[in-house]
UniProtKB/Swiss-Prot annotation:
It comes from Nicotiana plumbaginifolia (Leadwort-leaved tobacco). Gene3D superfamilies: YVTN repeat-like/Quinoprotein amine dehydrogenase (2.130.10.10). The keyword Repeat applies. Pfam families: WD40_Gbeta. The keyword Membrane applies. This is Guanine nucleotide-binding protein subunit beta.
Length: 377
């Protein structure tokens, strides 16, 4: 058989797979007689409303000299780590707004950062394809810098996202532009498992984000530029447990729902979607029409501790607060008083759900306190 014939057969097989996938998608839509918001409205549910005192800026964290790209809270809720274009990680006391650590990075092109469950170390990664670990309790060197305590090397592309395994300081999962996710043993610096890559059932484009289930740390979900999200079990690296096909653009961000049975995705197609990992079904689409025809991309997201609210950052600088039950925007954080002067770039909620932190291209971070909505956050 000639190369041309092989290519033709491959193209025909690919088209058949795509046709079957579309038929499956349409069949699922037929079987789902309603979505979450439709059912909620039928039960008489009303959307959350926000007044001027329901989400208030209570702290401004100033110290970076470049755009803030990423942030993360400690589980004990009183410290934040942020990564910036200025090539530094800064650890903040969220109660006093003071810096406790300022770490100069070996590579300034950082894209992601994470706090360990104990709060004793932080991790970051970026265009150097390495995930660097810093022990916050280690002594500084003669130049006043914190030395790298461990460099996790093995990716062949940029490190786009990292997250510690819950309740473990010794294991961490990264996603990369090399189309893989990796589970690392931080103690040895070695890869425990590689998800994707040479395996047939992995992503076929850059992996942009990972999120680990808090209720079952063996499960994590990844989002990729191949327009899919995939559910993985850390005990089975050879294939994804389930693949979710619903977006029409790159999946830039994924986040588990608080109960661990669902997760959300955010995409270049301008939508966020909620999926059930048990059935594989899409439960809801969150989309805000824009009259100018230019659809802003979803770049980051976070659920409130109850799951009732979804905070979503868009490429045009908007930061919408969605009522997940009724699929309705209840607030644009970028338009409220005392919001950032630049576009909001990243966001995250404290472990107890009582505070929201946003990072911005204006080099600052802001902490927002909830007023009258503690019952739904």
């Amino acid at each position: 058989m000639s190369v041309t014939e092989l290519k033709e057969r491959h193209m025909a097989a690919t088209q058949t797979v795509n046709d079957l996938r579309e038929k499956l998608k349409q069949k699922r839509l037929q079987l789902l007689d309603t979505d979450v918001s439709g059912y909620a409205r039928s039960q008489g549910k009303t959307p959350v409303t926000f007044g001027p005192t329901d989400l208030v800026c209570c702290r401004i964290l100033q110290g970076h000299t470049g755009k803030v790209y990423s942030l993360d809270w400690t589980p004990e809720k009183n410290r934040i780590v942020s990564a910036s274009q200025d090539g530094r990680l800064i650890v903040w006391n969220a109660l006093t707004s003071q810096k406790t650590h300022a770490i100069k990075l070996p590579c300034a092109w950082v894209m992601t950062c994470a706090f360990s469950p104990s709060g004793h170390s932080v991790a970051c990664g970026g265009l150097d394809s390495v995930c660097s670990i810093f022990n916050l309790n280690s002594p500084i060197d003669k130049d006043g810098n914190h030395p790298v305590s461990r460099m996790l090397s093995g990716h062949k592309g940029y490190v786009s996202s990292c997250q510690y395994v819950p309740d473990e300081d010794t294991h961490l999962i990264t996603s990369s532009g090399d189309q893989t996710c990796v589970l690392w043993d931080i103690t040895t610096g070695l890869r425990t498992s590689v998800f994707g890559g040479e395996f047939q059932f992995g992503h076929t484009a850059d992996v942009q984000s990972v999120s680990i289930s808090s209720s079952n740390p063996r499960l994590f979900v990844s989002g990729s530029c191949d327009t899919t999200a995939r559910l993985w079990d850390t005990r089975v690296a050879s294939r994804a447990q389930r693949t979710f096909y619903c977006h029409e653009g790159d999946v830039n961000t994924v986040k588990f729902f608080p109960d661990g049975n669902r997760f959300g995705t955010g995409s270049e197609d301008g939508t966020c979607r909620l999926f059930d990992i048990r059935t594989g079904h899409q439960l809801q689409v969150y989309y805000q029409p824009h009259g100018d025809g230019d659809i802003p991309h979803v770049t980051s997201m976070a659920f409130s501790i109850s799951g009732r609210l979804l905070f979503v950052r868009y490429s045009n600088g908007d930061c919408y607060v969605w009522d997940t039950l009724l699929a309705k925007v209840v607030l644009n954080l970028g338009a409220v008083q005392n919001s950032h002067e630049g576009x909001i770039s990243c966001l995250g909620l404290s472990a107890d759900g009582x505070x929201l932190c946003t990072g911005s291209w204006d080099t600052n971070l802001k902490i927002w306190a909830f007023g009258g909505h503690r019952s739904v956050i």
